[in-house]
Amino acid sequence: MTRYRNAHWWILAILPLIALAFWPGYFSQIGTSSVAHHVHAAGGTLWIMLAAAQSWSIATRRHALHRALGRAVFVVVPLFVAGGTLALVAMATSAVARTDPFSAAFGARLATVDMTSVIAMPLLVRDALAHRRHATRHAASMLATVLLVLPPVLARLFPSLPGFPPSFVAACDTGQLAAAAIALTLWLRDRNAGRAFAVVAALQSFQTAIFALYPGEAVARTLAATPPFPLATAAALATFAMLWTAWRPLHPLVRIAPAV
């Protein structure tokens, strides 16, 4: 695989951006953060590190290590989904309860937008597993998942830029569209094997639209009324099963004899 041979350096560059973006709201008060936020942070960080390690291992032809690390998706991806689900419920609960002005204004919309990313991420990984014999498509689907984490990171960093308007909506829209532009550019480099990037570009454009047009109150109320840990457990188990069917495709119990 030569097309994405340096992708791991770009992935690793996201980690310090995450630290800067989430320092005020999470890392600076990590001791008082909720379990939901800890699981969410752990799942996201582990996934980025795994994606970087997978890119590096295959670029340096460490095929045995690449295959061994590949099995970690059955732990890290369900953890990512479980953490994302817990964070969604927490965000929705704050939005419904209007615990603070930010949650009251944006919590329901953000929960709706983030829910689509939590759903899309394991679907992209499943596509990567299902096409693991096609190196470029496999890599593109894996790398596309990393672009899903960019919008919330960029939305927290853009307001610190000189001259950027002091608007959370503008920061969110700019973050979404910047990530979509990156995904679209990567897709244009390879419109066949890189179709996962087109999916992410379309998703992030859709997220920009629903953030602006859909208040998300019904979604927030539904999430807030759902017990978080049973929901997160069910989501993690469903994710594991979905990945396993791509890793070990089901074979028919009865084989049809060839025509004579």
Residue ranges and their predicted role:
Residues 1-260:
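Alpha-helical membrane insertion/targeting regions
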